[in-house]
């Protein structure tokens, strides 16, 4: 469960990211594909080469979903319900992939904002991404 300070840390970090969220989402997705090649199996129709427009566009979708989650932090199940249905019933994404992408998002944010990436912020973002992952996989049961 996210504490009030966790929510404040996540919101403050997301505010600092600002217009770069889509860029960072694409970078994190590229990093996921490079570090965990099995994640590529869900995107056979994508050009997965570095700098691919398709990867950048999907990364922006990921970032937009996270921005929505940050804005609706008090009701993540409602905010992510459509995405949860999509990933569970249509795409059938292995739940472990959410953890892999979450890790790559943390690395990407730490690379771009090292001064702001304090242990407390790191812990709050990790809890937030874990909570988002839990919500996204809740329909798998």
UniProtKB/Swiss-Prot annotation:
O2 binds at residue 58. InterPro entries: Globin (IPR000971), Globin-like_sf (IPR009050), Globin/Proto (IPR012292), Hemoglobin_a-typ (IPR002338), Hemoglobin_oxygen_transport (IPR050056). The modification N6-succinyllysine is found at residues 7, 11, 16, 40. One of its GO terms (biological process) is hydrogen peroxide catabolic process. It holds the Pfam family Globin. Red blood cells. The modification Phosphothreonine is found at residues 108, 134, 137. The modification Phosphoserine is found at residues 3, 35, 49, 102, 124, 138. The modification Phosphotyrosine is found at residue 24. GO terms for molecular function: haptoglobin binding; heme binding; metal ion binding; organic acid binding; oxygen binding; oxygen carrier activity; peroxidase activity. The modification N6-acetyllysine is found at residue 16. Heterotetramer of two alpha chains and two beta chains. Belongs to the globin family. This is Hemoglobin subunit alpha. It comes from Mellivora capensis. The gene is HBA.
